[in-house]
Design a protein with these regions (language model features):
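FNR/FR-type flavoprotein reductase catalytic core
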Residues: 80-167
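Ferredoxin-reductase
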Residues: 2-90
């Protein structure tokens, strides 16, 4: 069941090419999230943009006890809404509705998985990679971008044994 929460920005890491990784504290939402799900996000402090924007959950943040305490979003600054996320400072608040969408389902027993992504399309696979590794699945990520600035965060996949192919 989705929840509507006000998430607090803990950090905002800028990446090349106008990308950023936003870490949000929202334990009630994070504890319900599964690989492949997304949230609808809107700035709490303003009416523009009027509509929420969908963002795949990039990663789950865990506290010292291993409980999900928040999540990260992968963002590319393009318009007003993504610009607000890109400029967000620690302590900023965003309205988040989620988790939404059907999580990834794994065939039983999966032997091999291929993931194909480019740019921010990488986000849902960051939570899938450890789930695949935990089931002993050999995974390959085919990843592309328009420029070298669109290739990032590959370090999130290597610890899980994911073979990365840059297209």
């Amino acid at each position: 069941m989705p929840v509507d929460v006000e998430a607090v920005v803990l950090s905002n890491t800028r990446l090349p090419g106008g990308y950023s990784v936003l870490e949000l504290r929202a334990p009630e939402l994070a504890s319900l999230a599964a690989p492949g799900q997304f949230v609808m996000v809107r700035a709490s402090h303003c009416d523009a943009p009027l509509l929420r924007r969908p963002y795949s959950i990039f990663d789950l943040v865990r506290d010292a006890d291993g409980r999900a305490s928040g999540f990260t979003l992968l963002n590319k600054r393009v318009g007003v809404g993504s610009g607000l996320l890109y400029e967000a400072a620690p302590g900023a608040r965003f309205c988040c509705l989620g988790p939404l969408g059907r999580p990834f389902t794994l065939a039983a027993p999966p032997v091999e998985a291929w993931m194909v992504a480019g740019g921010v399309g990488l986000a849902p696979f960051a939570t899938l990679a450890p789930a695949l590794a935990g089931r002993g699945v050999a995974a390959t990520l085919f990843y592309g971008g328009r420029t070298s600035a669109d290739i990032f965060c590959l370090d999130r996949f290597e610890p899980h044994g994911v073979r990365v192919v840059i297209a």
